[in-house]
UniProtKB/Swiss-Prot annotation:
Superkingdom of origin organism: Bacteria
Keyword Cell division: no
EC numbers for this chain: 4.6.1.17
Class of this enzyme: lyase
Oligomeric and partner information: Homohexamer; trimer of dimers.
Active-site residues, record numbering mapped to chain: D125
Reactions that this protein is recorded to catalyse: (8S)-3',8-cyclo-7,8-dihydroguanosine 5'-triphosphate = cyclic pyranopterin phosphate + diphosphate
Gene designation per UniProt: moaC
Keywords for this protein: Lyase, Molybdenum cofactor biosynthesis
Name of the featured protein: Cyclic pyranopterin monophosphate synthase
Amino acid sequence: MLTHLDSRGHAHMVDVTDKASTAREAEAEAWVRMRPETLELIQKGGHPKGDVFAVARIAGIMAAKKTHELIPLCHPLLLTGIKVELSAEGEDRVRIVARCKLAGQTGVEMEALTAASVAALTLYDMCKAVDRGLLIEQVRLLEKKGGKSGHYQAGQAM
């Protein structure tokens, strides 16, 4: 069942008024592939635009807080925790992991996915002048906890 469609097939924001407030968490990831020289430049702090990981981290945090402004039917949420981590993996990839949490009436999956996506886009933006071959790949939900649908972990059947 698609919860954002009414009986006539019209899109609407889901009414969560009567739902209990529960602890909810979500974790998402994104990967960015680049030339080894680009990753080395980032790691050594020699990028002309500054600390790429720090800027991407802040962009991801800001994006999570603005998810409802970007995705039309998302509820505005009072997130109580947002964490965005970037790490070099191998010689040519960066892994971005975003975690969001709150005590509320709706989940935070879209916030975590938005944080990871915007952090990846920011990394791309900051590095495109030195590497036109950047590739953003595998943006996905890793884990979701809380709420009516319970616990989900990537790789598990729904």
